[in-house]
């Protein structure tokens, strides 16, 4: 990067190369906008085209997945693996199965993952993968055949010291198990190549809970700086998958009232607050029955708002845990108007750039996902460590390590994001802290 190029000129150069990748361009703009003033004060990070290199993945793998459905028909899906940066360690990031999956979404996720993994302080690079395969409505046998077909190509590109995938949207313990099983068969090795595995074959206690718990731990640290906490607060959560479920569980444990959950059909609202038993019932619904919140609401006499998002409901703490760009500028204005204290992202980039601007302008405590949802990948790193040492830690040990990591991430964000009167810009703090770790590693290793 030349000393005279402006931020807008740099972003135009990125857009010129990838004009049809809006999610990736959005992620790059969000990160670089907060990095630019830091770079102007620290010219050593303008050397060796560090930013240009970070805006270009090490490798993009795209391939066809052919599989047979229960009717004997051949189906074809597209799959990807984005290996973004191995400067700090092997590529690490989840696999997403959803019809919306495309190159832009996975490049944005891999880009964010490199910064997120750097924040954990664990030796992990960044990557992401997935397919436009939709597991909804598929039988277990169909999901198994698809996962096995996918790994027949993916296995060439992953390994315990090369690239270690995990789960994401549409990929839970079932899918990870099918992929890990085929990987073992093809590689003739039992090495840790996937994380998020079942406990019966090398998984870690607390891994399912880690992302959701981590979001709550991070929000707790943010609130503590304002002499606040979860006790007695109203919490709105979007989503009803793994992250949302355990964020709700931990929020209840901390004394909060969880008033919303959502899925693609709409939003479940319970003004009195969901009980622990109801949250456990949602886990059963989503993880085992694979049902819908609308049916759950009808059975339990709760309010369900079809086609609605949770952000119009008055709340103290908002935890967007569904998907990217689910919370827009108007949603953010509504939350601010209703007096929201804290927004901590459980999903990856769930807030649009406009929404982020609204939160920052209002002085709302706002944590970007690369910081607040890093607990999941951090615990994946702990799973890798346990596998390498051929041992397993107790749930309490893993939870204590997770809590300590989230505290460290928060402190790093404060270190780089603290402003006048003790206010913290967590967006700048997270982006700068992650960048410094990545950039120092890249500078030390030369132009490679």
Residue ranges and their predicted role:
Residues 1-205, 437-446:
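N-terminal ligand-binding/catalytic initiation module
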Residues 2-27, 222-223, 336-448:
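Adenosine-phosphate binding glycine-rich loop
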Residues 5, 19, 23-26, 30, ...:
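Conserved active-site and cofactor/substrate-binding residues in soluble primary-metabolism enzymes
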Residues 35, 106-109, 179, 215-223, ...:
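Buried hydrophobic packing segments
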Residues 185, 220-228, 324, 333, ...:
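Conserved helix-loop functional segments at active or binding sites
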Residues 195-198, 203-314:
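Glycine-rich phosphate/diphosphate-binding loop of Rossmann-like nucleotide-binding domains
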Residues 266-366, 371:
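Rossmann-like adenosine-cofactor binding region
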């Amino acid at each position: 990067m030349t000393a005279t190029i402006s931020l807008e000129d740099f972003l135009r150069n990125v857009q010129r190369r990838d004009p049809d990748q809006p999610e990736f361009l959005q992620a790059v703009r969000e990160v670089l906008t907060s990095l630019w003033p830091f770079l102007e004060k620290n010219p050593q990070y303008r050397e060796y085209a560090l930013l240009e290199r970070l805006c270009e993945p090490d490798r993009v793998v795209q391939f066809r997945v052919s599989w047979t459905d229960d009717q004997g028909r051949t189906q074809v899906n597209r799959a990807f693996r984005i290996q973004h940066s191995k400067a700090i360690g092997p590529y690490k990031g989840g696999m997403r199965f959803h019809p919306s999956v495309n190159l832009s979404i996975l490049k944005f996720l891999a880009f964010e993952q490199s910064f997120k993994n750097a924040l954990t302080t664990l030796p992990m690079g960044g990557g992401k993968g997935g397919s436009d395969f939709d597991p909804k409505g598929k039988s277990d046998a169909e999901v198994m055949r698809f996962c096995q077909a996918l790994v027949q190509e993916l296995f060439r590109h992953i390994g315990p010291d090369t690239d270690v995938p995990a789960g994401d949207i549409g990929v839970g313990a079932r899918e990870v198990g099918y992929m890990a099983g085929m990987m073992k068969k093809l590689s003739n090795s039992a090495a840790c190549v996937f994380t998020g595995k079942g406990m019966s074959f090398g998984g870690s206690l607390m891994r399912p809970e880690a992302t959701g718990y981590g979001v709550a731990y991070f929000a707790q640290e943010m609130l503590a700086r304002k002499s606040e906490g979860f006790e007695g607060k109203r919490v709105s959560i979007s989503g009803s998958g793994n992250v949302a479920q355990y964020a709700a569980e931990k929020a209840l444990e901390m004394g909060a009232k969880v008033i919303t959950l959502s899925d693609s059909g709409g939003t479940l609202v319970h003004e009195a607050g969901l009980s622990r038993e109801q949250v456990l019932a949602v886990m059963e619904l989503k993880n085992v029955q694979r049902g819908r919140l609308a049916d759950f609401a009808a059975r339990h006499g709760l309010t369900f708002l079809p086609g609605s998002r949770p952000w119009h409901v008055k709340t103290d703490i908002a935890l967007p845990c569904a998907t990217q760009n689910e919370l827009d500028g108007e949603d953010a204005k509504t939350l601010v108007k209703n007096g929201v204290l804290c927004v901590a992202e459980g999903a990856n980039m769930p807030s649009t750039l406009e929404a982020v601007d609204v939160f920052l302008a209002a002085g709302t405590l706002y944590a970007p996902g690369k910081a607040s949802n890093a607990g999941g990948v951090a615990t994946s790193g702990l799973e890798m460590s346990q596998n390498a040492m051929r041992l397993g830690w107790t749930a309490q040990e893993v939870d204590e390590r997770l809590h300590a990591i989230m505290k460290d991430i928060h402190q790093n964000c404060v270190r780089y994001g603290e402003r006048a009167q003790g206010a913290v810009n967590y967006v700048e703090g997270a982006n700068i802290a992650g960048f410094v770790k990545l950039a120092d590693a890249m500078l030390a290793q030369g132009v490679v």
